[in-house]
């Protein structure tokens, strides 16, 4: 692809390279770890009970659950967060959650999350789409497509 990964902490072109935010590079990026909090329509999931609550809510109301697997030390995860927040405010017919891959490491592994951010779209508990990497335009496109699917089913 022509992009060169600097690995400290991320690529020169954040949106198209996901190699830098895999788990093996987290140690290098830790020194630049900043805190960022989720507010508003995005629900942080740090316990399996909260996951069960959100997936049950989505399934019982016929909503799409959008799951952002992130890492606090990952620059693309931080970069995409405001866009994810904006999408959650725009598409209120969907439920948006974030999962820190270190807080729920085993669960993230079960969902085959090898790089962050990874965004998974679920309908009726089943994966309908997935985005790996911090491509904001692609995230917006996939979210709009999921919303259109909900409209057509209404």
From Swiss-Prot:
Pfam families on file: Thioredoxin
Domain Thioredoxin: 23-148
Gene Ontology MF: a single term: protein disulfide isomerase activity
Gene3D superfamilies registered for this protein in UniProt: Glutaredoxin
An example Gene Ontology CC term for this record: cytosol
Keyword tags: Cytoplasm, Isomerase, Phosphoprotein
UniProt KW Translocase keyword: no
Tissue specificity statement from the Swiss-Prot or TrEMBL entry: Ubiquitous.
InterPro entries: Thioredoxin-like_sf (IPR036249), Thioredoxin_domain (IPR013766), Thioredoxin_H-type-like (IPR050620)
Phosphoserine: residues carrying this PTM: 31
Subcellular location as annotated: Cytoplasm
PANTHER family reported in the protein's UniProt record: THIOREDOXIN, THIOREDOXIN-LIKE PROTEIN CXXS2-RELATED
Function: Possesses low disulfide reductase activity, but efficient protein disulfide isomerase activity. Does not possess deglutathionylation activity.
Similarity remark: Belongs to the thioredoxin family.
Record protein name field: Thioredoxin-like protein CXXS2
Organism: Arabidopsis thaliana
Native organism taxonomy: Eukaryota, Viridiplantae, Streptophyta, Embryophyta, Tracheophyta
């Amino acid at each position: 692809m022509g992009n060169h990964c600097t690995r400290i902490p991320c690529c020169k072109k954040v949106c198209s390279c996901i190699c830098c935010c895999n788990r093996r590079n987290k140690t290098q990026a830790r020194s630049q770890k900043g805190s960022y909090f989720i507010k508003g329509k995005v629900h942080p999931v740090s316990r399996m009970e909260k996951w069960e609550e959100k997936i049950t809510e989505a399934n019982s109301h016929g909503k799409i659950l959008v799951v952002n697997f992130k890492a606090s030390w990952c620059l693309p995860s931080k970069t995409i967060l405001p866009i994810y927040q904006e999408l959650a405010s725009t598409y209120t017919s969907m439920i948006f959650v974030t999962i820190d891959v270190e807080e729920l490491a085993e669960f993230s592994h079960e969902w085959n999350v090898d790089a962050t951010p990874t965004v998974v779209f679920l309908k009726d508990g089943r994966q309908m789409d997935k985005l790996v990497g911090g491509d904001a335009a692609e995230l917006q496109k996939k979210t709009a497509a999921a919303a259109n699917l909900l409209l057509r089913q209404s």
